Structures are given as structure tokens and as C-alpha cells.
Amino acid sequence: MSFNHREIEKKWQKYWEENKTFKTTEDDGKRKFYALDMFPYPSGAGLHVGHPEGYTATDILARMKRMQGYNVLHPMGWDAFGLPAEQYALDTGNDPAEFTEKNINNFRRQIKSLGFSYDWDREVNTTDPNYYKWTQWIFLKLYEKGLAYMDEVPVNWCPALGTVLANEEVIDGKSERGGHPVIRKPMKQWMLRITAYADRLLEDLEELDWPESIKEMQRNWIGRSEGANIHFQVDGHDETFTVFTTRPDTLFGATYAVLAPEHPLVEKITTPEQKEAVEAYLKQIQSKSDLERTDLAKEKTGVFTGAYAINPANGEKLPIWIADYVLMSYGTGAIMAVPAHDERDYEFAKKFNLPIKQVVAGGDISKEAYTGDGEHINSDFLNGLNKEEATKKMIEWLEANGKGEKKVSYRLRDWLFSRQRYWGEPIPIIHWEDGTMTPVPEEELPLVLPKTDEIKPSGTGESPLANIEEWVSVVDPKTGKKGRRETNTMPQWAGSCWYYLRYIDPHNDKQLADPEKLEKWLPVDIYIGGAEHAVLHLLYARFWHKFLYDIGVVPTKEPFQKLFNQGMILGENNEKMSKSKGNVVNPDDIVESHGADTLRLYEMFMGPLEASIAWSTKGLDGARRFLDRVWRLFVEENGELNPKIVDNPETDTLERVYHQTVKKVTEDYEALRFNTAISQLMVFINEAYKAPILPKAYMEGFVKLLSPVCPHIAEELWEKLGYSNTIAYEAWPAYDEAKLVEDEVEIVIQVNGKVRAKLHVPADATKEQLEQLAMEDEKIKEQIEGKTVRKVIAVPGKLVNIVAN
């Protein structure tokens, strides 16, 4: 008989909700465990089967930790600002707030149907003014400390969408959404000075229990490099420009310089003969994003300005070019090119027939750039020195002659924080007619997003908020001075930078969260989510956390102690699930056909949590069959408990496999090896089917071990075993090391290396006892009859080999 999952799952979900089973208390006597999921963006499409994979993993840990006596914080919320809702509003004329609310209600229903043990009283929503009041408060603090500032920056402007796009949203000069042309244009934007935290963001990675690959991605993104700034004079002008280089030792090999096309000097130094070519080039590259411009595989392009720089080391004239692979936003927007020892410079020099001068011995520079180490040559006072010595000496020379200085540079840029969007947190700043700006006073927060019937791009580069005159225009009540509110909104990253803090104290209207509660719950013990957030979200959240630490709001330097990325669930054909491919699996359908417990079990059993694995209906059916077997072992056809389940039996049936199961499942859950833990649960059930009687204590222990993965069926079986309370807070099973030892082992007996018999012997039998048992075995006696035994080799617990001829 199979169990009725629809009935059982609804029954227990109702029970948990009515009894607030998973409400987190501030119980001081217990150890704490904070299990966090990356909260979802509530899209119109609803939950897909990829979401529950990470959610089930944290839920298993949360449920186990409760049973181990921990006070567990396991919350859920919504990252609900963002582009898709705004795009929907633009397309349909509907309010993004209503659309978002509808989607959240659907997501919440779906998540509840999967039986996760969230404390729903702590739900947060980034679009709730009571939440974003504190997002705005953090912004004001950043502004107070000089970490939020306005700057004119070249941005990816998309005229059709009427907005600025992030680099990641531009592909081949077109918007990722809709494929509209994108151009680069300078605009005033809000920036956050994340670079002020670059060193700490780098160094503190060492203390975190994170996958090495994610740490490495963050290190590369921050991109710390040591070198020197070198100042170049422009020949015939009183202008200079600075380049940052990690190889100041190769300065004698510099044969040309390259400026970013946006560099302010370009206009001043371009000669009349080159003006037309330079302007044509600037027009040509207008639609390329930074990512495309720096693509190593792309053909190099560039144009000569007609001007020359003076090499400070030897007075030689270097032609100044512009090329799109040099970015104004990286380093100083200018490079010195040493083509003999840099692949990119070499390629450029070959293409445009520029000189190549070797200054480090080694390689064949007629064929390719030599990037290895060697003695310096053609380098005056550096000749004969190696890289390290030459670098040190050149920096000393530059500093002594006022031509440069030692410098640390970062790949990390300040964070472009404004979006020309309606559906985001308003930035609480007022711009006055006299050119000054002031923050909105703290007591006036939240600055609420105004309701509007018409969300359309302003077309001026401002957000749709610029169209709402009665909201934008303000008058200073004290002076009568007129002003306009900031019309840009914050990016979707803002709300997700600190949501894990709000869960700790979600209803506090006096402060972001109570310091005592933060002290108690931080840092997050396990954070599980997709690897696509490896760099930006995690870096931004760490930056805000460190800032909040500096101003005394949070007690820890880092937010997330342990991080884990689950893999992706692919379609049955091994392709990424997508609506266009028609291979999306909807969890609602699975909950209906197989049940939430089956879905949870299957997703944890598919393979290692970090692996990307194809969905398989056969695998799903297999998971359901296992749960049916479990049910049949406990429950008779008539719904009564199996009479084989007895209290205090006079036997040690199942003793060893039970203790092995408790040990393995506990260790595997802790280490997130859910697939091998489930295999062990299956081993136990197989053994139990062979047993003549089933000791009740072991069967209860099994149900407890199963409960974090399949909570509904576990609650039902717990009730069948005679308990009236939820299983959620029952004590986690313990194992006895002594019971894990096998009393008997099977050994093989070989004659001349061939297996002739197998014997069950006591696990602690000595060599002498094994020899004796082997020689007394009837089959072996037959084999060696009439032969002389030359040697007997006994390996306790394994084998006996008899050499006879």
C-alpha cells in the first residue's frame, strides 16, 4: 500500500502553521544556529525545481540542529525590487507593486507546499517601506562618511529602454533585454566607495569557510597589484599623464603609449592631421561595453593621435595612440606599451608596425613577446639585474627624480549605485537650486516611492520619477529655497546587501536591529545559494557589513561564516531549463503527483549538492518507491502499526546497522553529503525488511533521521508510533562506537592463491586461530589431501592462503 501524500502533507503543514512550530525564540540558554537561503526574486514564472535544492539543504540542517538542541534561525523573504517588474509595468501599464505582491503570494504558497521549516513571522520584503527605511538609513550613513558621492562617469546608455545598463547587461553593444543598441555617454551618477575597503575585503577572505573557487573569484575581482605610477610629459605641451605599471623595470623597453579614448588629454593633444581619424574612431567604439573592449580574443584596434610622450628614463619620443582596450575606468586610463614583454602590446605593435625593443634577456621576440624572467639588457643602470632587483632600483630612481612613485592598484572600481528606474528604493537626497545638496533628515525616513499610473522612461536619462512633479519638487520650509529630489533609485543589490540582518529583528521601528540580538545571532552559520552571486552580491554584502561594523552597528567583521553553492538542475536533455526550450519542471506538478517529501528526497539524492545534474523522472519515481517501502515497513494495510515493531526485544537485531546509520547520516548531513546519507537510510531499510522483528527504539531513531529530508511522512509515522507531539524538537539519535564494530567477519580461504572456501569467524580471531579454522574446514581438507603444506599466510579479518604442492 502506498501512502496518501496529499492528505498527509496538507495535514502537517496546517499543524505547523497553527502551532507556529518553527517560531524562533530568543532562548539564551541554547547554542545558536543561523541557516540562511539566498532569498529569491519573486518572478512571474514562480518557483522552479532549482530553488528547492538549496532550500532543502538548509532545511535539513535547520531541522537537525533543532533536534540537537540548538536555537535555530531559519527565515525567508523576498528580493522584490528589480527590472522585470518594471518592464512588466511598462509593457502592461499595471502597477509593479501589485504585480510583485501577486508573485510573492504565489512564491509563498509554493514554498509552504514544500514543507520548509521557516519562521514566517520574520518574513522580509525589500519593497516594504518599513524595510527600505533602513536601506535608506544605511545610504545616509555612507553619505555622512564620504563613502557615497556623485561623479560623472561614462555609462552604458540605452536610448530605447531609456536607462543606464550595468556592464553585465550589455552583450555585443546591445541590451541583453530586447537587443536594443547601447552607447557610452557620460552622466552624473551616485557611486559607493567600495575601493576604500579593497584591502580588508581581500585579507578577510582568509578567515572564511568558503569554497576556494569563490574566494579566488573575489580575489581576481578585487585584483590587487603592486607596481609604480610613472609620469610622462607630452612633447611640445605642458601636459603630463600618469600610467600605472606592475613592471616599472621594463621602462627602457617602452616604445609607445596608449590612452583610453575617453581620456581628457585626447582632445588637447590630437594634431590637426589626425583629428578626423581620431573622431571617427571615437564614434566607432561608442557602443562597446567595457567587457567587450577588454576581450583578449578580439582583434586590436586603435589610432595615432599625432602626439608624442617623452620616456622619463631615456628621453626617447614615444608615439601616443588611443585604443579601446585601455579603459578610463581602470588604473589611470593610460598605459606605457612594452611590446617585447607583453602579449597584448606585442599584438598591437605588430599590427600597426610599431618598434619592439627587448629589455629582458630570453625568448625569441621576432616570434612572440617574452613574458618570462631574465637579466635586464638595453636598460642602462638596470643591466644585469633580475626582475625583483630591477623593479626596486627603478622605483627608487623614479622617486629620486620626481618621475613616479611606488603604488598599489586595484581592478575593483567604485560601485555605480544609481539606476534610472522607478521600481527601486528612492535615494534620500535633495538637490537645491543653489547647487548644494542635503540628505533627507533621518526622522523623515522612509522616503516612500510615490504611487503612479504612468511608469515610462523620462527619456532624459533621469528615472520615471522625474515625471512626478508633485513628488520631485520641494521647498525648504525655513528658507523658501526650491529643490528637487534625487530621481535615481538604488540598484536591486541594495536591499539584498543587509537582509540577513533584518531577519534577526524584523519588526524593530527604532533601529536596523537590536544590537544584543545581532550579537547573539551573527555571523550566519551557513549560507546556501547559487554560484551566479559569487562576486557581486557577496562582495557588496561584505562591503556594507564591514562599513556597519566600523560605525558600531554589527559586532562581526564578516557576515557569512560558511558559504555553499548548490549546483544547477538541468533539463532531462542536460540543457539548462528555460521556457523557450520547454524543459522547465514546475514543482507544483511534482508536489501534486509525487509529493513534497519525494521531491525533497529526490533533489538531495540526485548527486553531490554542488554538482550540476540532469532532472530524471525515473529518479523521481525511484525516490517515491523508497518512501512507499518505508511506509509499508511501518504501517499495515489497515493503517495499524506493523506488529513486528516491538519494545525492548531480547535480541540485538539491527543493532550494528542502526548505530552505523546514525553515525553516517549525522556526519553526512553536517558535511552536506546528503546523497550518501540517504544511501545509508536505504541500507537500513533493506536490512530491516530482512529482520524477523523490529526494535521500536531503532525504528523511532530511523524516523528521526529521515525527518529533516522528508518531514511530512516522518511526522505521520511518529504519530503512528504513538506520539502526539511534533517530531521537530525530539532529541537527535546518538550512536555507540562500541556497537559499530562487527562481531563476525567473512574471510576467504585460498589454496595456492585460488579462493576455495569462505568462513564466518569472530572479528577478533588471531592468526593462529584462523590457521586452525582453515585447516579444519572440510572443503580445504579435500583440496590439500595428499599434498605437503609449505606455508600458511593468515591476514586477520581478511584471508588465509595455504601454499601446498
Swiss-Prot record:
GO MF term list: aminoacyl-tRNA deacylase activity; ATP binding; leucine-tRNA ligase activity
Keywords from the named record: Aminoacyl-tRNA synthetase, ATP-binding, Cytoplasm, Ligase, Nucleotide-binding, Protein biosynthesis
GO process annotations (BP): leucyl-tRNA aminoacylation
Residues noted as binding ATP in the record, renumbered to the chain: K579
One Pfam family of this chain: tRNA-synt_1g
Reaction(s) catalysed (UniProt annotation): tRNA(Leu) + L-leucine + ATP = L-leucyl-tRNA(Leu) + AMP + diphosphate
Protein name (record): Leucine--tRNA ligase
Main location class: cytoplasm
Cellular compartment(s): Cytoplasm
Gene Ontology CC, one term: cytosol
InterPro entries the record matches: aa-tRNA-synth_I_CS (IPR001412), aa-tRNA-synth_Ia (IPR002300), Leu-tRNA-ligase (IPR002302), Leu_tRNA-synth_edit (IPR025709), M/V/L/I-tRNA-synth_anticd-bd (IPR013155), Methionyl/Leucyl_tRNA_Synth (IPR015413), Rossmann-like_a/b/a_fold (IPR014729), tRNAsynth_Ia_anticodon-bd (IPR009080)
EC number of this enzyme: 6.1.1.4
Positions occupied by motif 'HIGH' region: 40-51
Family of this protein: Belongs to the class-I aminoacyl-tRNA synthetase family.
Record motif 'KMSKS' region, residues: 576-580
